[in-house]
Amino acid sequence: TFMAGIDTFDQLSRFLKHVDRAFSGNLSAFEVMWNDYYKLVTTPPSLNQAPLPENYNYYVLVEAMGASEEQNQQALEQALEEDLIADAVIAQSETQRLQLWGLRDDVAQVFQFAPVFLFDVSLRISCMQDYVEKVNKTLQSSFPDSKNFTLGHMGDGNLHFAISVGRDDTQARKLVEAAVYEPLKDIAGSVSAEHGVGLEKKPYLHLVRSQSEIRLMKQVKH
């Protein structure tokens, strides 16, 4: 298990291919944290220590089934040589491994900024960078103080947003949902990556599913 700090999205997607190759398809985790999320979970009141400096745009937690320390070391050295990553830290013990996972899993920190809107979306990796930038730009134009804490299982194309805009009235919710869901339409994304389609996501299904697909989903549920 190790964590790497990465500067650009291009490096990040190339690094995913690199580790997938290096571990011969035995990659069990490739968890990406955007800079704002990493800062949130490594500064008080969060109790986590920052294993890497806070100046990288992306932080990725990588785990491969049955990988030896030597394999981890080799994969990282090669990635550094190829300029895919800027910095990295390898867990030397189970305690350190759990500390690294603790960062990824400390999602409750977002509630410092309650009320918070939570979203799961899925889309192709090649569209991710533009999509996240578009969502943030739209949020900023409606809510200049908005925060969007972003993380995801990049290998599966899943992203999680925890968005705070300082209020949660119906109008705010509609604006936030539109900012997240509307851009998915043009890139064949999905509005619900992991947790099924809840009631609040129903109005947006038509953006990313054809009518026949929606009918089929309804039949499957009954």
Q: Which role does the model predict for each range below?
A:
Residues 1-222:
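Noncatalytic alpha-helical scaffold of FAD-dependent oxidoreductases
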